[in-house]
Amino acid sequence: MSWLDQITWTDDGLVPVIAQEWQSNDVLMFAWMNREALALTAQRGEAVYWSRSRGRLWHKGEESGHVQRVHEIRIDCDADVVLLKVEQLGHQPGIACHTGRHSCFFQLLKDGAWQSVEPVLKDPSSIYK
């Protein structure tokens, strides 16, 4: 049995993936992978995801230059979630979110309202052309 066969895939053939910064342990983003994306990620050492909105493979950083170098690939106890320990690279290292922030998890629930608690490191309009 292949290591890919040991993953518990959804009915759509996907697995949820959390990208975590390998040095700080900050959670950077959540995404999905299909079998091909996970195999390519392991082969290339860079994160490749499945974009559900585009219906295609998405090499992280293909447009922005903010590539994720993969240091470790882990699965949880049920083999139904993948954890990537990554180094977030790019023209301005540390940007993982398409909003120009370090993490996609920049909104904090406080007093019944969502508040942005991380700064924009680079204007997204200058990242995506």
Curated annotation (Swiss-Prot):
GO molecular-function term, one example from the UniProt record: magnesium ion binding
Note on cofactor: Binds 1 Mg(2+) ion per subunit. Binds 1 zinc ion per subunit.
GO BP annotations listed: L-histidine biosynthetic process
SUPFAM superfamilies, A to Z: HisI-like
Residues the record lists as binding Zn(2+): C77, C97, C104
Keywords, sorted A to Z: Amino-acid biosynthesis, Cytoplasm, Histidine biosynthesis, Hydrolase, Magnesium, Metal-binding, Zinc
Cofactors required: Mg(2+); Zn(2+)
EC number: 3.5.4.19
Listed Pfam families: PRA-CH
Cellular component GO terms held in the UniProt record: cytoplasm
Pathway terms, separated by semicolons: Amino-acid biosynthesis; L-histidine biosynthesis; L-histidine from 5-phospho-alpha-D-ribose 1-diphosphate: step 3/9
Keyword Transmembrane: no
Annotated function: Catalyzes the hydrolysis of the adenine ring of phosphoribosyl-AMP.
Oligomer status and interactors: Homodimer.
Name by which UniProt lists this protein: Phosphoribosyl-AMP cyclohydrolase
Species per Swiss-Prot/TrEMBL record: Leptothrix cholodnii (strain ATCC 51168 / LMG 8142 / SP-6) (Leptothrix discophora (strain SP-6))
